[in-house]
Amino acid sequence: MNACRRNITPWRLRSRTLELGRRTLIMGVVNITPDSFSDGGRFLDPEAAVAHALELLDEGADLLDLGAESTRPGSRAGGAAGSEYARAVHPTDEDLSLPPQEAKTTSWGPRLLGTPAVSSEEEQARLLPVLEGILRARPEAIASVDTYKTATARAALAAGAEIVNDVSGFQWDPGIAAVCAEFKAGVVLMHTRGRPGEWRAQPQLPPDELLATVRAGLTASLAAAAQAGIPPESIVLDPGYGFGKRLAENYALLARQAELLSLGRPLLAGLSRKSFLGHTLAPLFGGNDAPIEAREPASLAALAAAILHGTSIVRVHAVRPAVETALIADAVLAAARGGPM
């Protein structure tokens, strides 16, 4: 495997510009939800969430990503039981092999196809006090808001957020791109293969077709951004690991991730504690998926692979181990290009 050569690229945010590619930037996750798969509502209280965010910054996070609606396994969004949602978002190969009419139904999919599971008002009520508290304590902090809703994006940007991280890549709420353009925000556009309620009906794709599908989806997101007046230098792309991809597809995508750099924008990868990592570790856990708390070493291995395949930003839950891993991977990249470590 040849290490990828990242380009040094500016990323223009709402009030500042970051340099991407010289070293890997660490985006620390702050979940402000009662049902996050990773931390189970530990930081729903605003004071606890702010304290956690400040700890992540002290551990070396370059950016913070604040989310107030869970889009991960174990969520109870829209009234769905956690196991129902987990199967909708990260279905097993058995689930995915069933014809659509035989697949198990969930309450999450239809809601996401229609109205959001968490209203924008509730999302803002969770999010804004934490965002404001972080910026009071650390005015220099760079905050991203993880949302696909126009109203939430507007409120967060007005409150000082620099970045909108949209898991739908501007595909689920048509107004959000215009808001990002209005505020001159940085944006992260992620690829999601359809919507969660549709994923079980989708066939497994061979690597070439999978990469073409991800490329086409990200190209559509770039077109939506351009139509809204968002300049390319404000955009980072995310391949969307775990979002509408089976276990084998995630690894195929990771192995060929660097080919997405041909789209002309830097890459962000969110691999931390993902369920496909837990499934891969199942032989070590009696045939069961590795529990969340046991996935950190696998997360770091995936993080290193992503960096060596062209990622400029990694989105993580445990910041200090990610900082250390990124330093080693960046040293490999520097050696590959013949530059200083």
Indicate where each model-derived feature is located.
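Catalytic domains of carbohydrate-active enzymes, especially glycoside hydrolases
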Residues: 51-67
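N-terminal amphipathic alpha-helix/helix-capping segment at the start of soluble metabolic enzymes
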Residues: 1-31, 226, 230, 333-341
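Glycine/alanine-rich phosphate-binding loops at beta-alpha junctions
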Residues: 9, 45-46, 65
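Active-site-adjacent loop and "lid" segments of alpha/beta metabolic enzymes
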Residues: 13, 38-55, 71-85, 112-137, ...
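Catalytic-pocket segment enriched in acidic/His residues
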Residues: 34
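Short, low-complexity intrinsically disordered segments enriched in A/P/G/S/L with frequent Arg
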Residues: 89-90, 94-104, 110-116
